[in-house]
Amino acid sequence: LSFFLFLNLSVLLAQEPNAQTVKDSLTTISLEEVLLTGIRAKEDIPVTFTNLSRQDLAPRNLGQDIPILLNYLPGVVTTSDAGAGIGYTGIRVRGTDATRVNVTINGIPFNDSESQGTFWVNLPDFASSVEAIQLQRGVGTSTNGSAAFGASLNLETDAVQEQAYAMLASSLGSFNTIKNTLRFSSGILNEGFTLSGRLSQINSEGYVDRAASNLDAYYFQGTFKDETTLIKALVFGGQEITYQSWYGLDPD
């Protein structure tokens, strides 16, 4: 259609060379790309899932790893080398091992690139920096490959803390287990920036003989927020010193 219109217009201009040329009123607007992600399940899709908020985790968050905190959910079985839920722990969902449980933190894959498992011992007390958790049982919504065959575990880290605060918490438990956690936030500053963080230390002798754990962790988050923008930059990590329970127990 546009081809024939062009010919007709050309003929008209050729017959009337003195006619006034009308400028094209069309304008071109270049739009930025839009990225759509589908990590979390909702009620209107056929996926079995459980949502847990920070308030749901708080009564159980006494220093144990995230798999142990999820042990009461349907279809979940957890393991602990030391027997106390601290140190090397594992999770199975509907009989599927950790290599088929896709773990994401803020939508970013966290599974080990070689073994496809997740070493929770490197994230001690990470539950203290989690805003919400969603566990999808069975094939889920993850876009990160075949690791979501068995289940998907989505972790959402701390939301923006608008008020300044500092908090020190300590927990004591069996087998000489001690957890100390320091959390803080600057609140929203003049330009919309916020700095928050967490420092944690966990020590436990473990239920199994010679299964002690000495764990340190940090989490720092910087955010910028205004009416239309939210930018987060975060860094976290941990250091673990564990005894020889990794090698199992001798039959004798």
Which residues make up each language-model segment?
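Sec/Tat signal peptide C-region and signal peptidase I cleavage site
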Residues: 9-14
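Short, acidic, small-residue-rich periplasmic hinge/interaction motif at the N-terminus
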Residues: 16-59, 98
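Short, glycine-/polar-rich solvent-exposed loops and beta-turns at beta-strand/coil boundaries
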Residues: 27, 76-87, 108, 114, ...
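N-terminal periplasmic accessory domains that precede
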Residues: 33, 66-69, 89-92, 104, ...
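Extracytoplasmic beta-strand/coil segments of soluble accessory domains associated
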Residues: 67, 71-109, 131
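Outer-membrane beta-barrel domain signature
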Residues: 80, 140-144, 170-172, 207-209
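Short acidic/polar hinge/loop motifs at secondary-structure boundaries
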Residues: 109-137, 156
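Transmembrane beta-barrel wall of Gram-negative outer-membrane proteins
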Residues: 165, 172-203, 208-247
